A protein has these predicted regions:
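Well-ordered, non-membrane alpha-helical segments in soluble/globular domains
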Residues: 31, 84-94, 213-227
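Short, conserved charged micro-motifs
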Residues: 21-27, 82-84, 123-124, 204-215
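N-terminal low-complexity, intrinsically disordered segments
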Residues: 1-76
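Short glycine-rich, low-complexity/disordered patches
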Residues: 41-52, 97-118, 138-159, 223-236
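Glycine-rich, often proline-containing surface loops adjacent to acidic residues and nearby aromatics
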Residues: 7-15, 62-78, 103-114, 190-203
């Protein structure tokens, strides 16, 4: 059976770090009102140098944020693989539409996915399967279309200007609740599963408009799900 994103527990975090934008401090309220008026993220809160957004007071599945040094979006267990990209881009475009906001040059574009897919195996059984079937370096090259730079418990790859760091392994539910960011979804965490932590990043990409962000986000989001699917198919 192929990996069904609706049956996994996951969290996806986009963070775009840029050079300091001091004027953000003066326009926090303007950004809050403008983005809230668009309708996707109407609930906001302001701290010293940051504005956080949510779809509602009760909804903890999504968070958008903008500060004097970064802008980003978080989605927990999206309904589809495309959901993260579409929601994040709508939020970013809502912020960019504020006339007084201008994002400085980007110093780091990062996208991190933590994915836990369930298994019917015991922990010992899944560990045995993992030791027998874990992808070899050549297979990882094909999965990511990238060259391995380091290999061990953590694998580091590079595709063009994009770096990829991957770690994964069998995990019991209690460990997932306390040692990963998935603990916020503790009611959905299985007793045993295979955990993957996939980090894509690019340093100093310079100026980025919404089209460049959308293209790169689409690439790394697809790459993360492709990796999760490959591991799922190999192990289960």
């Amino acid at each position: 059976m192929p990996l069904d994103e609706k049956n996994v527990v996951s969290e996806h975090v986009l963070e775009i770090r840029h050079r300091a934008f001091g004027r953000l401090i003066d326009i926090r309220g303007l950004i809050a009102d403008a983005v809230a008026a668009k309708g996707q993220m109407p609930v906001w809160s302001i701290t010293d140098s940051r504005v956080d957004f949510k779809p509602s007071d009760e909804d903890q599945r999504e968070v958008g944020f903008v500060s004097h040094r970064n802008i980003g979006y978080v989605v927990r267990s999206p309904y589809t693989r495309q959901y993260m990209h579409d929601r994040a881009m709508r939020f970013i475009r809502d912020v960019f539409a504020v006339e007084e906001y201008r994002m400085p040059d980007v110093v780091r574009f990062g996208f991190r996915s933590q994915i836990l897919f369930p298994t019917r195996d015991t922990f010992a059984g899944l560990l045995k399967k993992t030791n027998e079937r874990m992808p070899l370096p050549k297979q990882l090259n094909e999965v990511f279309d990238a060259q391995i730079e380091d290999y061990g418990q953590i694998v580091v790859l590079k595709r063009g200007e994009t770096h990829i760091r991957l770690r994964g392994g069998p995990m019991e539910g209690e460990q997932a609740k306390t040692e990963t960011s998935l603990g916020a979804q503790k009611d959905r965490i299985p007793e045993v599963g295979f955990f993957m932590d996939i980090d894509h990043w690019r340093t100093n990409p310079g100026p980025m408009d919404d089209r460049k962000i959308s293209t790169l986000l689409q690439q790394v989001n697809e790459s993360a799900w492709k990796a999760a699917s490959a591991y799922h198919d190999i192990l289960l």
